[in-house]
Amino acid sequence: MTSIRAVFIFLWLQLDLVNGENVEQHPSTLSVQEGDSAVIKCTYSDSASNYFPWYKQELGKGPQLIIDIRSNVGEKKDQRIAVTLNKTAKHFSLHITETQPEDSAVYFCAAS
């Protein structure tokens, strides 16, 4: 029998209340098959935002910065993880390729 392993990616909405920034994350939950790609999108409200980090929080651990991007860059890659930014549309996305079981975590974005 073939075993199908699913990678569960749980998402968290991060609101940057210090700067009054509202950030919305879509989808709220995501499940993909091992080896597939996953994309998580965030939209933000303040066009003055210039720093866009993504965090990963594994069960029982604190959040860890996994990748970030500045407003003067459209795309940044680090191994299987990439982030893209569209300042005009006010959204940025986290892309994870070739998902693995260790990718199962809570992911959240912020903007400042």
Curated annotation (Swiss-Prot):
Matching InterPro entries: Ig-like_dom, Ig-like_dom_sf, Ig-like_fold, Ig_sub, Ig_V-set, TCR_variable_domain
Localisation: Cell membrane
Transmembrane segments: none
N-terminal signal peptide: 1-20
Gene3D superfamilies in alphabetical order: Immunoglobulins
GO cellular component: T cell receptor complex
Disulphide bridges: 42-109
Function description: V region of the variable domain of T cell receptor (TR) alpha chain that participates in the antigen recognition. Alpha-beta T cell receptors are antigen specific receptors which are essential to the immune response and are present on the cell surface of T lymphocytes. Recognize peptide-major histocompatibility (MH) (pMH) complexes that are displayed by antigen presenting cells (APC), a prerequisite for efficient T cell adaptive immunity against pathogens.
Name of protein: T cell receptor alpha variable 13-1
The species this protein was found in: Homo sapiens (Human)
